[in-house]
Amino acid sequence: MSSNKARAVVGALVVVVAVVLLVVLKGNNNGDAANTDGGKLQTIVVRNAKPVGGIRQLTYNKGEQILFKVESDVADEVHMHGYDIMKDVKAGGSVTFDFPATIEGVFEAELEGRKEQILEMTVNP
Amino acid sequence: MSLLHALPLAHALVARKDLPIPAWLFAWAASIVLIVSFFALSAAWREPRFEEEHWRPIRARLSRDLLGMPAQLLCGAIGVFLLGVAVYAGIHGTEAPDRNFTITFLFVTTWLGFPLFSVLLGNVFKPFNPWRAIGRTVGGGFRVLAGQRSAHLPYPERLGRWPAAIGLLAFVWLEIVYGANGGVSVGLEPHAAAVAALLYTLYTLAMMVLFGVEEWCERGEIFSVYFGMLSRLGCFGVSEGRLGRRRPLSAATKWATVPGSAAVVIASISATSFDGAQDGAFKNGIEHTFHWFVDRGVGLAGALHITDTIFMALTFLGVAAVYLIGVRGMSTVQGAPPAKKLRSGFAHTLIPIAFAYLVAHYFSLFVYQEQAQFTYLLSDPLGTATTNLFGTASAGIDFKVISANAIWYVQVGALVVGHVLGLTLAHDRATAYWGDYRQAARSQYWMLAVMVAFTCFGLYLLSVANA
């Protein structure tokens, strides 16, 4: 009998720990869906064939409009992977990307010729 | 960070990376795992149920057709042909990994496809194994010409499956460390993959000459051992030359009787863990170590290879340590068999965990890349835009086929199911080893801790992927 009691206690403890874990982690999750880059024009500046300030991170929710401009001092092709959009940019010129966030996931944009990543884009559901 | 990006970046094989699982899902999954584990302990059975296979043959005609010589010849020929195509495309095709047949065929279609089909349909790699097909054909030819069987050296029993375990680590090292130019999943170049396939062919055929075809496939041939291990989970198997059905999981209980088997399954878990962690959980550690080597004058590529190798080795040791601690704990329970018997006796309980890790980490890659495999990679295997064999050379991958939510549920579902199956096997083995079911249940607190550790680690890896 006592071993059954011990089991009941351990079982109750496990459930309590699980519920606490759930509540704590669930609480953390609210809020990160609100602040996205949706619909705002973002500019990625490329100097010496590298993105200024490192690889740019942009976050969207599915259905929002993705809008960013690449200003580059080198001529190359900007490739938005996953969405598979490619646009040429001239040295000293700029190119604008404007498309809806239809595919969820994490995607890269790079200077295709140089294999230089300039953007990491996250689209949340 | 900046230094890592000074390295030439290879194209990631797949353009869409998985989103990390959200915290609420992590919490749900972890909670379910804890609760299920607890009830598994208290409500469990007292007599072993999986030690016997309860094997029943399927219809004799169907079995004969599937296992007969014509089918064996056909499957073997297909295997040899596809290996040939992969080597040819690797050597003569483009060096862009995502456009060349070779990389996707070897590292996605074969490496991830056979585990799936092995679990569902049984040991399907065996008939398609190109090296076994070549070995048996040559052996058969020798028998006809010389009128006697070829003599082989006796395989050293103590080596067991260690060659396969080491080979498995070497294969994954080749896939994600050797070719990794800045942390992409499959950074290996097609030419290198083709050369590696040729070298492995030579090595395998040499070992088959030494020890015999079936002997080497059972112990040392990486892919036979690995896919064969996973096929033990399913309900189809061959016994005495006949195909039959058995109780699912039951064949796994007899798998780890050969030395080194635990190392194979630990190698599998650690390889998948390392691949999942290098871009997420280990990212900071890898960067830190990488800079440490660079500051001491090691070249960039060399520093990255050394760092990745160290982290991969540490992952293997870490996974092994968790398992060995569990074994050690069990050996303190009254009536425990010797530690050596425990060590090999519970190794098979990790097979479902290994498969769950595989599904969780590569499910989406498989879904995307198989679209490429059966469209443009089939029509234009060299990736040079010179052929369009089936008219599908200009097709692309539809990344919309699975939503982020669907991927998350598959990932978490795989880990939870793998956890339950692992616990099931462990509990069942304990009831076989401990006559007294109370002691058996007590020993299982240790295996429960091991399984919870692996499952929560797996969930953790998914929750920080690409962070």
Q: What are these language model-derived features?
A:
Chain A
Residues 7, 21-39, 89-125:
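Extracellular/periplasmic metallocenter environments
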Residues 56-74, 96-110:
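Beta-strand cores of secreted/periplasmic/IMS beta-sandwich domains, seen most often
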Residues 35-65:
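N-terminal edge beta-strand
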Residues 2-13:
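N-terminal Sec-pathway targeting helices
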Residues 11-21:
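Core hydrophobic alpha-helical transmembrane segments of single-pass membrane proteins
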